[in-house]
Amino acid sequence: MEQIPFVSSSPNTLGIELELQLIDPAGFDLAAASDELLAQLANHPVADRIKPEITRSMIELNSSVHEHPAGLLAEMREMRDALCEAADAVGVSVSGGGTHPFMRWQERTISDTPRFQYLAEMYGYLARQFTVFGQHIHLGVPSGDAAVRLVHGLSPYVPHFIALSASSPYREGVDTLFSCARLNAVNSFPLAGHLPPEVADWYHFEAHIAQLRASGLAESIKDLYWDIRPKPEFGTVEIRVCDTPLTVERACQLAAFAQALAVLLEREPSPPTQAWLAYRSNHFQACRFGLHGSYVTPGGQRVRLADHLKALFVRLMPVAEELGTTDILQSLRDEMQRGGNDARWLRAQFHRTRELSGTVEAMTQVFRGESAAQRRAPQAARRRIRASSEPLGPMSMWPERLH
């Protein structure tokens, strides 16, 4: 069995990847402009941290390693500003959000790299449908065994990350009725899912990967589209379920939340085996209903996810005080309780404009750090795109059995 070396990292360090949308400011559809944007940035100090993604309407920001979310936020703001300046120069805009509200997958162009071309050939239309946008959070760990323990420890909290970050209610001009529709695209791939519960340490992880390779199911860990996975070459655990938030500020709040949760989990016993029983159901509830979903705890109790999150924030606050991140977690908690998640904000924007193109325009403004109420210079007449179903109202429409 081939060993997989694990590069040791300092515990509790963090970093993020953000997949972002490139927008045509004339009609607010996606723009296939990543090559032009990367060329514009080629001589900029942040150039090595900005990468292409699977289709040319996407771009990815990669942070450095940080000990504190404040340093992460400063770096992400620097990269955002550089990216937006370069985007202005090539005539496009940039936004967050887990999906573009009305793009058509048939119109996407695969990026010209060997891996992306292979994925397009292997997965057909799924590769172009994979024009969705996620945030990946990396947490430093000292060893492979520690990585496996942390993956298992974080797994019951996958719904919390999904609901807090959800920003993909619209897809191809339709209100999907999901808070997070993006993960439905991810789950189409054969190796989506999670680390098997029986993989208890790094030795068993290596054995599992060897089995996948021997049977021709996977060539490398990159082929595993798991919700959370070890990243041995970085020395991290990678949380992959978050939609890209609408702002870099929210992205860094989520990273701070993950950091505090990882520290808390180091001090608690591993979740019981029965915690996996409701994994898929909890996952669906968070995607479909967001913070209003139901949640089955590792102990088997059915509660509202928002209530479980409130209790979790109480447990996290002493850890946040130790880490010096109390203000960041308090802001995330308060924003959750006051305004919900980005999916709710997007639906409110659609209610205001009644056009999805207007919603995308607001997305580009808030990503730049502007108020959604601020208007940029007048643009050319834009394509009128209306959602083909009404946005969700309050979640009193729940089936009774969920209460």
UniProtKB/Swiss-Prot annotation:
E.C. number(s) listed in UniProt: 6.3.2.2
Top EC class, one word: ligase
GO BP: any one term: modified amino acid biosynthetic process
Catalytic activity: L-cysteine + L-glutamate + ATP = gamma-L-glutamyl-L-cysteine + ADP + phosphate + H(+)
Entry keywords, A to Z: ATP-binding, Ligase, Nucleotide-binding
GO molecular function, one term: glutamate-cysteine ligase activity
Family annotation (Pfam families): GCS2
Region Disordered, residue ranges: 370-403
Domain of life: Bacteria
Protein family membership: Belongs to the glutamate--cysteine ligase type 2 family. YbdK subfamily.
Described purpose of this protein according to its UniProt entry: ATP-dependent carboxylate-amine ligase which exhibits weak glutamate--cysteine ligase activity.
Record-given protein name: Putative glutamate--cysteine ligase 2
